[in-house]
Amino acid sequence: MNAITSAPAAQTVHVPLGERAYDILIGPGLIARAGAEIASRLKGRKAAIITDENVAPLYLDALVASLDAAGIASAAVVLPAGEKTKSFEHLMTACDKVLEARVERNGCVIALGGGVIGDLSGFAAGIVRRGVRFVQVPTSLLAQVDSSVGGKTGINSRHGKNLIGVFHQPDLVLADTDVLNSLSEREFRAGYAEVAKYGLIDKPDFFAWLEANWKAVFTGGAARIEAIATSCQAKADVVVADERENGQRALLNLGHTFGHALEAATAYDSRRLVHGEGVSIGMVLAHEFSARMNLASPDDARRVERHLQAVGLPTRMAEIPGELPPAEVLMDAIAQDKKVKGGKLTFILTRGIGQSFVADDVPASEVISFLREKHP
């Protein structure tokens, strides 16, 4: 880990994907610089901004002004906030706005929002005119460290989360750390679950650093930028090695198989559970299941749980408000998850902190038994 200095210097993470390479800029004041940064990289001078009703009042005017100053004409569509926006209905609304704005293939779609807006906007950018340029301006911690990087886009289906989508890499990611100051504590904590995930995958030193420095990350400044940059670099490394999720990129789904099932079980109701909270519970369950399978020490699961509890994240299914369906229904959601190949359950399990691996033949009977223990 880099030493923390008092001055929050901006950082750049480069994602080397050949002709589709791009930069992730991380630091304060980037929305004000967005127009100049986009104009220096893209030839088109038309943009469609896709945002939501929570983010638009805070940052849309500043983004439009920045684009105007750089000679980029823009039109915006404001969608409802929340996971349920990832639907065909709202996807078509977004696509219509891109076409209405006459954005050509050298123009761009700009996602101004959190993970939901980024996922939907990237999907729209990937299918309109068979692909237009795409810029991410993520406004949540979760989006800055996870969903804005890597090119996975999509919407939800009644069968599960993110099951319909395309790979469409952004041309630029502008992670303005100033916008994180407007997040609620719950939203920031939810994003932090994805930060911790990178340490648990294969960076034990980073996880230890987070255990020691998480309060500084929550406060802001240099520690926050360092945590975001380290997370983005970790994801970029995995994406470059396995862009289309044919192998090791699946490691990024640590905690997500259980987490997605819990999100589905709560009908994506953010009052009960948001994505990062599901991932938090899912990462603890993944470590506990690994211990049950004699792959890891129970002490590791307890260490993960202690840290996530310390930052205020839920770590147990019992902490989710309201009733959850029985283990068999959760198992059905797991089986529908996209991390299933040939009918075999694929989980990201662990041999210890920072020692995660892809297990592609997990017995369903063991999972059902485990879920019954955790959710009688």
From Swiss-Prot:
Cellular compartment(s): Cytoplasm
EC identifiers of the protein: 4.2.3.4
**Cofactor: how and how many bound:** Binds 1 divalent metal cation per subunit. Can use either Co(2+) or Zn(2+).
Task: List cellular component terms (GO).
Answer: cytoplasm
Q: Which cofactor does it need?
A: Co(2+); Zn(2+); NAD(+)
Task: Tell me, in a sentence or two, what this protein's role is.
Answer: Catalyzes the conversion of 3-deoxy-D-arabino-heptulosonate 7-phosphate (DAHP) to dehydroquinate (DHQ).
What the record says about family reads: Belongs to the sugar phosphate cyclases superfamily. Dehydroquinate synthase family.
PANTHER family membership = 3-DEHYDROQUINATE SYNTHASE, 3-DEHYDROQUINATE SYNTHASE, CHLOROPLASTIC
Indicate what this protein is called per its UniProt record. 3-dehydroquinate synthase
Print the organism lineage.
Bacteria, Pseudomonadati, Pseudomonadota, Alphaproteobacteria, Hyphomicrobiales
In the UniProt record, what gene is named as encoding this protein? aroB
